[in-house]
């Protein structure tokens, strides 16, 4: 590990070292906004020496959150809080990164500090719960387990709208000062659901073959690149298999 503490440059962005703080949900946002808590916590991580600092997965739409206390960047009012976060990270010598995502059929949960289910995991909320909503997915197939409420299968028009939501979120992230962009297409969230032949049983151009199941993530990447510039590096968090509950592991490819 001789290079762990040496600088690293990619696409004109230089990290002071190779140590990154991964996105970790903090459940401390109101209306998706970053505030003093996030400035303090993330600034301290940069001051402690992390070269690349991510907040949590940041939702591109209100329904893309895990809980109502998760961060978002779906409207311009949220830019100011994110700008405060990127400013303190840079001041402390780090590079601010952002992970954009949509939880898909794994959203609408109760914040963990508010209670868990009998298995000790996060508790999914019914769509008619005051803090819940109807989750969306490629097909009308719930994730299962606690997430067994009906989900809404996305229409083509809604898929196109999500392309725009990702692109607009990326534009806001750039305006807020983030220098490193990652897209969360793993862990059973929306992007991963499109990859998965278990979750995605569509019969149109977004389902069926591997090429069709790749279409949504690739269209998102293209929309983002068109908005913020193809010269800006995008990174993707992917997984090639996912163990849905008690089912055997399934190769996505």
Residue positions per predicted region:
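N-terminal amphipathic alpha-helix/helix-capping segment at the start of soluble metabolic enzymes
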Residues: 1-20, 89
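Conserved, mostly hydrophobic/aromatic
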Residues: 21, 45, 49, 89, ...
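Glycine-rich, proline-tolerant flexible connector loops at the mouths of alpha/beta enzymes
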Residues: 54-79, 100-120, 182-208, 242-245
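Non-globular sequence segments
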Residues: 87, 95, 101-172
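Alpha-helix-loop-beta-strand connector modules within alpha/beta enzyme cores
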Residues: 71-96, 198-232
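Catalytic domains of carbohydrate-active enzymes, especially glycoside hydrolases
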Residues: 39-61, 176-180
């Amino acid at each position: 590990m001789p290079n762990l503490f040496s600088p690293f440059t990619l696409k004109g962005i230089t990290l002071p070292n190779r140590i990154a703080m991964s996105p970790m949900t903090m459940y401390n946002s109101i209306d998706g906004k970053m505030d003093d808590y996030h400035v303090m916590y993330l600034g301290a991580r940069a001051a402690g020496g992390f070269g690349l600092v991510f907040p949590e997965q940041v939702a591109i739409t209100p329904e893309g959150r895990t809980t109502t206390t998760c961060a978002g960047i779906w409207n311009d009012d949220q830019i100011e809080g994110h700008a405060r976060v990127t400013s303190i990270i840079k001041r402390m010598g780090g590079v601010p990164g952002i992970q954009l995502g949509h939880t898909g059929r794994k959203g609408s949960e109760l914040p963990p500090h508010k209670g868990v289910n009998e298995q000790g995991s996060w508790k999914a909320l019914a769509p008619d719960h005051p803090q819940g909503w109807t989750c969306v997915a490629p097909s009308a197939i719930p994730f299962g387990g606690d997430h067994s409420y009906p989900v809404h299968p996305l229409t083509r028009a809604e898929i196109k709208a999500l392309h725009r939501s990702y692109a607009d979120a990326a534009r806001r992230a750039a305006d807020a000062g983030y220098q490193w962009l990652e897209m969360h297409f793993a862990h059973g969230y929306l992007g991963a659901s499109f990859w998965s032949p278990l979750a995605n049983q569509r019969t149109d151009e977004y389902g069926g073959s591997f090429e069709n199941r790749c279409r949504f993530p690739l269209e998102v990447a293209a929309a983002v690149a068109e908005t913020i510039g193809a010269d800006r590096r995008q990174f993707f968090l992917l997984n090639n298999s996912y163990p849905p509950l008690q089912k055997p592991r399934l190769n996505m490819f």
